[in-house]
Amino acid sequence: MAKGIREKIKLVSSAGTGHFYTTTKNKRTMPEKLEMKKFDPVVRQHVTYKEAKIK
């Protein structure tokens, strides 16, 4: 069976709340770290989420 090219990643809130989202990304087309603005329900506002490895 073929191994998938997409890798699971965790997007961790920069607000320091410990909240995170999980998603996948294609390592071949997006080798750099992912960074995006998403809603953090703990602080109830949009903050920057940065990529981290899933342990």
From Swiss-Prot:
<keyword id="KW-0689">Ribosomal protein</keyword>
<dbReference type="InterPro" id="IPR018264">
    <property type="entry name" value="Ribosomal_bL33_CS"/>
</dbReference>
<dbReference type="InterPro" id="IPR011332">
    <property type="entry name" value="Ribosomal_zn-bd"/>
</dbReference>
<dbReference type="GO" id="GO:0006412">
    <property type="term" value="P:translation"/>
</dbReference>
<dbReference type="GO" id="GO:0022625">
    <property type="term" value="C:cytosolic large ribosomal subunit"/>
</dbReference>
<dbReference type="InterPro" id="IPR001705">
    <property type="entry name" value="Ribosomal_bL33"/>
</dbReference>
<dbReference type="GO" id="GO:0003735">
    <property type="term" value="F:structural constituent of ribosome"/>
</dbReference>
<keyword id="KW-0687">Ribonucleoprotein</keyword>
<comment type="similarity">
    <text>Belongs to the bacterial ribosomal protein bL33 family.</text>
</comment>
<dbReference type="InterPro" id="IPR038584">
    <property type="entry name" value="Ribosomal_bL33_sf"/>
</dbReference>
<protein>
    <recommendedName>
        <fullName>Large ribosomal subunit protein bL33</fullName>
    </recommendedName>
</protein>
<dbReference type="Pfam" id="PF00471">
    <property type="entry name" value="Ribosomal_L33"/>
</dbReference>
